[in-house]
From Swiss-Prot:
It is found in: Membrane. Its EC number is 1.-.-.-. This is Cytochrome P450 monooxygenase 58. GO terms for molecular function: heme binding; iron ion binding; monooxygenase activity; oxidoreductase activity, acting on paired donors, with incorporation or reduction of molecular oxygen. Heme binds at C451. Its cofactor is heme. It is a multi-pass membrane protein. Pathway: Secondary metabolite biosynthesis. It is an enzyme of class 1 (oxidoreductase). It comes from Postia placenta (strain ATCC 44394 / Madison 698-R) (Brown rot fungus). GO terms for cellular component: membrane.
């Protein structure tokens, strides 16, 4: 996030005139002085690292800021403050602080900073993750929850089981292409839930790529400093002939709306014919009038679920593959649990889920060990607040350091080890970890902004992971000396939308010789 800001700032400084630089310095100075006067008149903000005059702490943040946030947590405590060129920032690093503020004071801490390009121009105010805490957000959120809550998500399980069988078959045919299979399976699984589409194939790669590009465009547009309109909001009102960025953004919005409304129309036609399967979009159309949503709002709510859900699920499955490669004992223990219950005559199903506690704990550990979203999208305080003697002014950016909370040694001893047993008691029953909404981790977020699709995501991860463990061994390749070539446990890449393992090699081999015959029989009888 800050890395993009710095790059944009340096580029602007290099191309600007001396007069423009002086005006920017004066504006920043006035903003900083005003902020300090107002802040000091009401109280002291939480402690934090010293920064530069005017620019504050923005030059102190690396490309992956959660590592630095976690270091500062050790120095300044579970809540500390920063200054981003005059904008106050508070970073939350513990379950207790997040519970006190984002959960119990959610009316103050549920708003977003204004994302003009990403949240207004490119999406017309209909991307729920960037939408401010108001009437539009509430009706979108309510409609989405109705279609993706625990009970509603169960309707998508037959489709997800079918996707898991296809994933296993594809992995058997082309084991070296395992990462591509995971990405296709993740996109196909969420698409089946959103639109009841049949399984995606290579012929659908263009469509999936277009949705992925849309999500990446939105993420990049949301980075601080990417567009000057975020610094000078009045620029939004420039005519399009004067603002190429605005003209291009509105054209992208038109194209993306046309695509999503086309998906909506297809579902509506199937509903009219009476031949349709349950899907998020079908439910949204059925309740459209009750929820007060327009066709465009339903189309965007459903369509953006695919991009966000596919990327995060695929990244989590990649973390699973990395963990199995590094922790073969964990893999064998999960396989033994599956074998004892399921046997070899059938694949795991959702009916087995309550009887596979170790596999369920393994899914939780995947999400905790290497969260694909190490910091949440920033929030903004909607009014002044005081917490434990500290003043948090209205308009403060609030960042939840998910990375630090998922690695809190007081809650997760040996936090850097992949150990599903941490979620089970001595009898093998699941342990509830306070402040995690029954998830065992905080990767899905907090309060009124908690991930709307987490139940569908949990289902997809469970059935895909159970199927892969049932069918395959996942191991490190061996070198010429016969020793395993282990992948890096720390080499990860930030792709904007997700944080995922860098490319690595692993060996995927069938656990039994006739697994292909068994899969063909299961698919025929499905």
């Amino acid at each position: 996030m800050p890395a993009s800001f710095l790059a944009s700032l340096r580029a602007w400084i290099a191309s600007s005139t001396i007069g423009q630089r002086i005006l920017l310095a004066l504006a920043l100075g006035l903003l900083l002085i005003t902020a300090r006067v107002i802040s000091k008149s009401k109280g002291t903000m939480p402690p934090g690292p010293r920064g530069l005059p005017l620019l504050g702490n923005i030059f102190q943040l690396p490309k992956l800021p959660w590592y630095r946030f976690t270091e500062w947590k050790e120095e300044f405590g579970p809540i500390f403050s920063l200054n981003f060129a005059g904008t106050p920032v508070v970073v939350l690093n513990s379950h207790e602080v997040v519970g006190d503020l984002l959960e119990r004071k959610s009316t103050i801490y549920s708003d977003r900073p204004r994302f003009i390009m990403a949240g207004e121009i490119l999406t017309g105010g209909m991307l729920i993750v960037f939408t401010g805490y108001g009437k539009v957000w509430r009706k979108l959120r309510r409609a989405g929850q109705e279609g993706l809550n625990v009970r509603a998500s169960e309707k998508y399980q037959p489709l997800q089981e079918s996707e898991a069988r296809l994933l296993t078959t594809n992995m058997l045919r082309e084991p070296a292409e395992w990462d591509a299979h995971l990405q296709r399976a993740a996109a196909s699984s969420i698409a089946s839930a959103v639109y009841a589409w049949p399984p995606l194939t290579k012929s659908d790669d263009g469509l999936v790529h277009r949705i992925d590009e849309l999500m990446r465009r939105l993420v990049m547009a949301g980075l601080p400093g990417r567009y000057l309109v975020e610094i000078f909001p009045i620029m939004k009102h420039l005519p399009t002939w004067m603002a190429k960025w605005k003209r291009e953004g509105l054209e992208w919005h038109r194209r993306d709306t046309e695509m999503f409304e086309g998906f909506y129309d297809n579902v509506a036609r199937f509903m009219a014919s009476g031949k349709y399967k349950p899907s998020l979009t079908a439910g949204l159309i059925e309740r459209q009038e009750k929820n007060g949503l327009s066709k465009k709002e339903v189309s965007w709510l459903a369509g953006t679920m695919i991009g966000a859900g596919a990327e995060t699920t695929a990244a989590s499955l990649s973390v699973f593959m990395l963990a199995m490669t590094l922790y073969p004992d964990v893999m064998r223990k999960a396989q033994a649990e599956i074998d004892a219950l399921v046997g070899r005559e059938r694949m795991p199903t959702f009916a087995d889920r309550p009887h596979l506690p170790y596999v369920c704990a393994l899914v939780k550990e995947v999400l905790r060990w290497r969260p694909v979203g190490p910091v949440g999208v920033p929030r903004r305080t909607s009014e002044d607040d005081w917490y434990k003697g500290y003043f948090i002014p209205k308009g403060t950016l609030v960042i939840a350091n998910v990375w630090a909370m998922n690695r809190d040694p007081a809650i997760y001893p040996d936090y850097d080890e992949f150990r599903p047993d941490r979620f089970l008691d001595a009898s093998g029953n699941e342990i509830d970890i306070a402040g995690t909404h029954g998830q065992g981790h905080v990767t899905y977020g907090f309060g009124r902004r908690i991930c709307i699709g987490m139940h569908v995501a949990n289902q997809a991860l469970f059935i895909d992971i159970a199927a892969l463990l049932w069918a395959f061994n996942i191991e490190a390749p061996t070198g010429p000396d016969g020793n395993p070539i282990l992948p890096s446990r720390t080499d990860f890449v930030d792709e904007g939308l997700v944080f995922r393992p860098a490319a690595f090699r692993c060996k995927v081999t069938p656990r039994i010789d006739d697994v292909a015959t068994m899969l063909a029989t299961l698919e025929k009888n499905a």
